[in-house]
């Protein structure tokens, strides 16, 4: 199975598998929900998620905010050296199930830094998408994810006339592997930001968007639509 660390913007409470009874931001390591926070998801409004981690504090933090100032914060103390392989890929994932929503990514940026004692070098990877083209060569698109419509990344499928569809899942990973940790590193860390628009015709939008870090050959587990957000093979 893939090794996944994720920050979920979970719009649908699957209380049968241990979700809180409201939309929430969650940090997940492997397939365990490590920490959750209540999130007032605003249907049809653009929200911004900012995720950060550094090897000194060993804390994965995320803030999801809206233009009206409403925000939710979740953080989890974790040493990524113990969880992830040294080289990883970063991506965005989303899914719908019985209920649906659009999972539109308007922009996405990422910066990682790895400072090593032995060589005094800093390895940094940085990318920024302020829009997505139809033929976006530096992204690996999986399953239903598409780019280019209105300059956006649509992580799940929408009909040609716009409405979201149910039981769809998609992911976009940056093509270049990221050196996320190294035993001799003095400082390792990253910052990621994405702006997303979740819009649903249903009174229950579902299921959510996640920023994730995985082994470089990660693929979408079969049957991971709905509550599994395209990340996990079973409902832990």
UniProtKB/Swiss-Prot annotation:
Keyword Metal-binding in annotation: yes
Binding locations of Ca(2+): 10, 12, 14, 19, 207
PROSITE patterns with a match to the protein in the record: LECTIN_LEGUME_ALPHA, LECTIN_LEGUME_BETA
Binding-site residues for a carbohydrate, renumbered to this chain: 12, 98-99, 227
Top-rank lineage group of the source organism: Eukaryota
Xref: Gene3D superfamilies: 2.60.120.200
Sorted UniProt keywords: Calcium, Lectin, Manganese, Mannose-binding, Metal-binding
Function: Glucose/D-mannose specific lectin.
Other observations noted: Binds one manganese (or another transition metal) ion and one calcium ion. The metal ions are essential for the saccharide-binding and cell-agglutinating activities.
Known partners and oligomeric status: Homotetramer.
Family listed: Belongs to the leguminous lectin family.
Name of the molecule in the record: Concanavalin-Ma
Species name: Canavalia rosea
UniProt lineage: Eukaryota, Viridiplantae, Streptophyta, Embryophyta, Tracheophyta
